[in-house]
């Protein structure tokens, strides 16, 4: 199935508002499930921009996905190709490699569904409810459509900050 990326220049308003709170709590060091702070250089301003993102970590590899489509952090990360992630109080500098359609399809089909399946019951329920709420059910049910609509980046270590 082919599809064009969703035109989602901004996340839903409830997400934008909750992101500010989530970012503040993460900066205070409160654990927020798989959420980490992504800081990337702005593609126009060059200034550091931070956003909370969910980090999928399995078998020593790490990915982040643009669950809301082409949001600003996705565009900035594409332009910069690198970022800092704050994980459990440690900041790491990473290279971000965007997956192509075939690799992203495999990520949604194999990696993400297995990752969500290993979450505690509440985590699984939360993930499924969130994807339904933001009209992104295909993330767990249609890997080809998810890959066409939602960018995925693998994060490769470049060093600690």
Where are these regions (language model features)?
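General secondary-structure edge motif
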Residues: 5, 18, 25, 57-58, ...
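Short strand-connecting beta-turns/loops that link adjacent beta-strands
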Residues: 58-60, 90, 160
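Short beta-strand segments
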Residues: 33-68
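Extreme N-terminal tail/first-helix region
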Residues: 1-30
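A generic local structural motif
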Residues: 23-24, 50-51, 139-141
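A short, polar/charged loop/turn motif at coil->beta-strand junctions and beta-hairpin connectors
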Residues: 30-34, 149
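Short, structured beta-strand-loop surface elements
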Residues: 11-12, 68-158
């Amino acid at each position: 199935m082919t599809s064009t990326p969703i035109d989602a220049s901004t996340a839903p308003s409830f997400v934008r508002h909750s992101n500010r709170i989530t970012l503040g709590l993460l900066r205070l060091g409160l654990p927020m499930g798989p959420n980490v702070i992504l800081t990337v250089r702005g593609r126009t301003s060059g200034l550091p921009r931070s956003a909370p993102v969910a980090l999928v970590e399995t078998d020593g590899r790490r990915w982040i996905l643009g669950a809301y489509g082409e949001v600003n952090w996705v565009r900035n990360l594409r332009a910069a190709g690198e970022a800092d992630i704050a994980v459990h109080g440690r900041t790491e500098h990473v290279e971000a490699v965007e997956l192509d359609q075939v690799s992203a399809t495999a990520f949604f089909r194999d990696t993400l569904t297995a990752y969500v399946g290993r979450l505690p019951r509440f985590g699984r329920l939360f993930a499924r409810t969130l994807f339904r709420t933001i009209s992104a059910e295909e993330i767990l049910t249609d890997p080809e459509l998810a890959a066409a609509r939602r960018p995925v980046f693998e994060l490769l270590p470049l060093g600690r900050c």
